[in-house]
Amino acid sequence: MAAPQITLSVLVIALLTCSVTAYPNGKVPMSCGGMIPQHNHSPQSEPIHQITVSQTTFKPGDQIEVTLSGPPFRGFLLEARDAENLSGPPIGSFTLIDSEESQLLTCTDVQGLAVSHTRSSKKTEIKVYWDAPSPAPDHIRFLATVVQKFKIYWVKIPSPVISQPNAPPFTTPKATTQPLTTPPSVSHLTKPFSAFECGNKKFCVRSPLNCDPEKEPACVFLSFTRDNQSVMVEMSGPSDGYVSFAFSHDQWMGDDDAYLCIREDQTVDIQPSYLTGRSYPVMDSRGTLEDMAWRLADGVIQCSFRRNITLPEAKNRFVLNESYYIFFAEGPSHDGRIFRHSQQPLITYEKYNVTDTPKSVGGSRSSPLLKAHGALMFVAWMTTVSIGVLVARFFRSVWSKAFFLREAAWFQVHRMLMVATSLLTCVAFVLPFVYRGGWSWRAGYHPYLGCTVMTLAVLQPLLATFRPPLHDPRRQVFNWTHWSVGTAARIIAVAAMFLGMDLPGLNLPSPQKTYAMMGFVVWHIGTEVILEIHAYRLSRKVEILDNDRIQILQSLTVAEAEGHVFKKVVLAVYICGNVIFLSIFLSAINHI
């Protein structure tokens, strides 16, 4: 596996839509030769559509009406070939009858050699004219590829042969007959899987650890039970599209032996596949699987199958008596076509041999580096910076006469917390680059906001080292600059945290993460508002009487004492609440 595991991205990122070659607009000139859609599925064997022609003989220059018809289909590709050399290039050109549903294609730099659809709407009939070239082969056969769904299509459906008047009789080439293969049977599961024998007879991968799919629909469950020279596999997970797992030599995606259970309407298609990097999985024959069964209930997809431990004839199937990392992913699908999953796959912490001693293991959906990045940023921008700001803004008078290392205590506390914030940010900033090996292009605005926060976090302590003396005229400018940079950093950091929680590399539980972050913001703003109101009311208690220009301060000492106690209580309560919110996020990170 050569490509780094996506953080967002995937086991079966394999399941990336961006890599799927599907053309709803019908512009498929690259398919002119083989006429095979690049859908990574096997074509159907028995055609249910037909091609008819308006005449069975032709001369060069004739225009023949060709009709493709049958049950509703969404896409098609129509060509004329030399009937005695169907693998040869397209012959002649086409003229459109309905330009809303069909269009001419350019093949081998010649316009009009083929016709395809213009849109993916359902259609039951397409009519075009074929213009016979001069010179022309003695016999012509039309071929059509028809797409009903993404994974249901027919390739090179033949038409009756049309011939020139004086041509020798057409002889159908002898076809090499192949024995018909009966597709493997698929049954319906009557009850959900159970985790009862996990660790005894079954090797199980579960998330949350020790969950039971029989009792918990949200349980991600994968089990392997050895039976002589085969392994029975059970897979279950909440999804409306597909669930999948893969065996991998490392924790990066690519070159993996994967298996998908894809929902199609009210059935499930069980499909072995092979992952090559971040591209769409290459679907393989189901002939390697036996005893296939599936079940749909309560938003959960469950499927099972049996596979031999060794498959010498199957190129991309791994032997199962070796150790691998195990991936589990789920995501959306439509008409049998799978799409990129929104969160990282579950990946076991180490390699396991599923045919060895039965165990019950778990995994993680996030890299330890990304977990550390998120945890450090939460500590820095939820806790240390927030407490540091409150101390500097509201507690100067409380600890103005207390000193620590020859500086006011409030200032030393503020400075230590802010230095801690900058150091935590610097360490956390590096971790995603180490994990990704560079810039993360799929992370949206989060990395840009993160770079901005990093810049401000470094700039802020540098500005503080040039702080002018207390009575210096430049002190006012410094104060405003210092406040502006700090406030901007905090606002951008909160925005970055909101976005980062949704990235595939972390993807904390929804909607709890949003409520928790909103709760933290309200908690902090509410605390600042309370302290501001208190400061205003305290100033109102100090009555200034102007009598012969002599100021008399009434009860100043008592008011200040009362104010200091109140502020300390508010700070203690705030820190407790802050730590609770921080613990919620750190716990969520630990459990993904």
Curated annotation (Swiss-Prot):
GO MF terms held by the record: metal ion binding; oxidoreductase activity, acting on metal ions
Membrane topology, from the record: Multi-pass membrane protein
Enzyme class label: oxidoreductase
Domain Reelin: 13-179
SMART domains assigned to the protein according to its UniProt record, in alphabetical order: B561, DoH
InterPro entries, A to Z: Cyt_b561/ferric_Rdtase_TM, DOMON_domain, Ferric-chelate_Red/DefProt, Reeler_dom, Reeler_sf
Keyword match Chloroplast: no
Tissue expression summary: Expressed in spleen, liver and kidney with low expression in brain. Localizes in adult brain to the choroid plexus of the fourth, third, and lateral ventricles and to ependymal cells that line the ventricles.
Major place of residence: membrane
Residues reported in the UniProt entry to bind heme b 1: 373, 446
One Pfam family cited in the UniProt record for this chain: Reeler
GO biological process: one example: intracellular iron ion homeostasis
CDD domains on file: Cyt_b561_FRRS1_like, DOMON_SDR_2_like, Reeler
Cytochrome b561 domain location: 335-534
Ranges in a coiled coil: none
Glycosylation: residue positions: 85, 308, 321, 353
GO cellular component, one term: membrane
Function: Ferric-chelate reductases reduce Fe(3+) to Fe(2+) before its transport from the endosome to the cytoplasm.
Entries under PANTHER family matching the protein: CYTOCHROME B561/FERRIC REDUCTASE TRANSMEMBRANE, FERRIC-CHELATE REDUCTASE 1
Record protein name field: Ferric-chelate reductase 1
Gene name of this polypeptide: FRRS1
